Amino acid sequence: DRKDLGMLIKTFLETFKNQRKQPALILKTSGATPSILDREEVLSKLRQIRDTVNGKLLPNIYVLHGDLSDDEMNGLYNHPKVKAHVSFTHGEGFGRPLLEASLSEKPVIAPNWSGHVDFLSSNAILLPGSLNEVKKESFPKNMRVKESQWFTVNYNYASKVLKDIFNNYSKYTVKAKKLSIVNQTKFSLDAMTKKFEEIL
C-alpha cells in the first residue's frame, strides 16, 4: 500500500480513541478500479484495521470511493468541516493532490520525503521518518528492484502532531495560509507557462 493508508487509519484511531470529543477522518480512495467489488474490499480492510484497535469509542471514518470531478474535489478540499489534509504516503512522483490541498489554506501534514517536498515548505507539517526496503509483496510480480526503498513516517510523532492540530488548530492556520499564497503564485498557470517556455 504505497499510500500507507492502513497505518494512517490505525494511527488516527489510536490517537483519538475513547475521547468524548473526536475528529473524523475522510478517506478519498479506491483500489484498482472504482467498482462495487473494489469498494467492498476497501471497506473490508477498514473493518480489519478497526478490529485491531482496542477502544470502546472509536472516531468515525468516512470513505469516499472512486473518482470525483475537479469541482467535487475542490468542494472537498474547501469544505468548512474539513480542517486539515493528511497523507502518510511512502513516496510520490510529484503529489498533485497535496499541492491542490495546500491551496485550501488548511494545514497539510505529509512525510518529509519525496516529490511533494518541492512545494510543501516549512509552512506545511512535514513528518520525520526513515527509508526502508520495500516489501516484495508491495510490487506486482517481477516488478521489484531489490534495492527499492520507500519512506515510512514516524507514527508516534505523527500521532502527536494530529493531536496537537486538533487541540490547538489556530496555531497552524497562519502557516497554512502562507503556504497557500506561495503555491498559488508559484504554481499558477502563468508561472508554469513561463517555466515551460524557459525550458523550451
PLM features: residue spans?
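A charged, aromatic-enriched C-terminal amphipathic alpha-helix characteristic of glycosyltransferases
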Residues: 149-157, 167-198
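Nucleotide-activated donor-binding/catalytic signature segment of Leloir-type glycosyltransferases, i.e.
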Residues: 32-79, 83-84
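Acidic donor-binding loop of glycosyltransferase active sites
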Residues: 75-93, 103-107
